[in-house]
């Protein structure tokens, strides 16, 4: 409106134009004085954009929700998801999105089955109450590797993992034993959930869990949603390995996976954890 008045001042007086547009002359002159200077909203957006760009430069895989959580956690900025989304749009940046993978039915091989005691109740009230595990695969320098992971459902922390070029029972037993030895002081019984893979139903693995008084739970055949949290995590993890850590350039795949696991445990905000990374959420709770 003030800009329209400015355009017509060569033919009409300011008094006439302000009367026509229904604004005060003092308002017009204040606008004229600060013309070309950003208002307080524009200044705020500029500061926000700088913060968003800084976070994006360090964590290019983060979407607007995670950047919003990090703004709140690290810089004390209380902003909405749409505000951060608009900031990213202004800057022409975006996080990485993951393509959904079609569900694959399970094997029909006969093997030992355990009941689905977890029953898609993915919320845990305390650490080491509910653990989920799964195996995924990664091709590196023309060779297939297998990665077994164990996640604590209390805070989505990867508490153990094992990388091997052999798809055998030791792939899941080694990290399980390390985890259970560390957590021998846990007073409550642990529920450990997996799919019906032959490694998880092997005598050695089942006996190991019994030795530590762990309750074993398994997904139903052909129901990947019974272990949805872990299945979903592997998708995000491998996308991050590819798009941020560029694992194919590394000569040490294990070291790269360790870096990515550190990122997910110590740096990546999780919305259900009040925007905090898993380890920070756990340590603040027990402190």
Where are these regions (language model features)?
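Mobile genetic element proteins and their domesticated derivatives, centered on retroelements
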Residues: 18, 28, 52, 67, ...
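Residue-level signal for the short linker/turn that defines the boundary of a DNA-recognition helix
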Residues: 12-13, 62, 79, 248
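RNase H-like polynucleotidyl transferase catalytic core
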Residues: 97-103, 192-196, 210-229, 245-250
